[in-house]
Design a protein with these regions (language model features):
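Carboxylate-rich, polar loop motifs that coordinate divalent cations or form catalytic acidic clusters
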Residues: 1-262
């Protein structure tokens, strides 16, 4: 009897240990804008957004809702084919169309804003977007295909309020070929390029081309592809960390979840 009970308990435990997965398939029949999805992201409010070949969609757990230009309506988008999306800290969504133009979808007003046109008129340029980097403090960085400059846009709760075009050589920017732009817990905005690293509106700038960064317990660690590892201290100075002999490449930095003990 004891053996039987143990066997039943073991079987029950094995059953409860199995993860439950509810897999559902969605298509245009369910309200998705198109069956071809170019990008998908989750906004801070936990809504799932999808960039498709026929507009922008979001899913709230029950239904899909789609936003795009329609015949007879106001034409804002140069194309409904959206290839990349970037939710902001305030739950608006940047959209990049197939011709590399950018638009901001306001979730408050439920409309697209022709940001690309506004930027071109303000700075007298022909913007071709490469990547966007929304930062938690509300700013968004825009990098370009030609690499001659980058753009910093500040967003209010609903709309953009200011933009700044930064050319190579300004604000410590060493190159327009940007690897990554990142905001740390103190609100500092880091720009990582192929020719060096800088913090926007700070004195810190280094020719070391850091490509990876991790923040652990208030400490910031940086690494270059060619094997250089450093810590960033509160004086905004780099402390180089020796690597084991023979290690000449770093492919990534990972946070294991362990925190330093003070």
């Amino acid at each position: 009897i004891i053996v039987t009970i143990i066997a039943i308990m073991a079987h029950t435990l094995s059953m409860t240990a199995r993860p439950y997965c509810d897999v559902r398939k969605f298509s245009i029949v369910d309200g998705l804008a198109a069956n071809t999805i170019s990008d998908m992201k989750q906004a801070p409010d936990r809504l799932m957004w999808f960039g498709t070949w026929n507009g922008l969609s979001y899913y709230d757990g029950y239904s899909f809702y789609t936003f795009r230009d329609v015949p007879g309506g106001e034409d804002v988008l140069s194309s409904n084919r959206i290839i990349a999306i970037y939710p902001t800290a305030r739950n608006n969504v940047w959209c990049v169309t197939s011709d590399r133009k950018i638009y901001l979808y306001s979730t408050h007003y439920c409309r697209f804003r022709n940001t690309e046109k506004s930027i071109n008129e303000q700075f007298g340029i022909n913007l071709k977007v490469d990547q966007l980097y929304p930062i938690k403090n509300g700013s968004t960085w825009i990098t370009t295909k030609d690499g001659n400059y980058i753009i910093r846009a500040i967003l209010s709760q609903e709309e953009e309020v200011s933009r700044e075009l930064i050319k190579v050589g300004e604000h410590g920017l060493r190159s327009g070929k940007v690897w990554y732009i990142w905001g740390d817990q103190k609100g500092r905005e880091w720009i990582f390029t192929e020719k060096g690293t800088t913090i926007y509106n700070h004195h810190f700038s280094t020719p070391l081309p850091f490509k990876w960064v991790r923040e652990v317990g208030g400490n910031i660690f940086l690494a270059t592809p060619d094997g250089k590892l450093a810590a960033f201290d509160e004086r905004e100075k780099l402390i180089m960390i020796p690597m084991p002999k023979g290690d000449t490449r770093i492919n990534q930095l990972n946070n294991t979840g362990y925190q330093p003990v003070n």
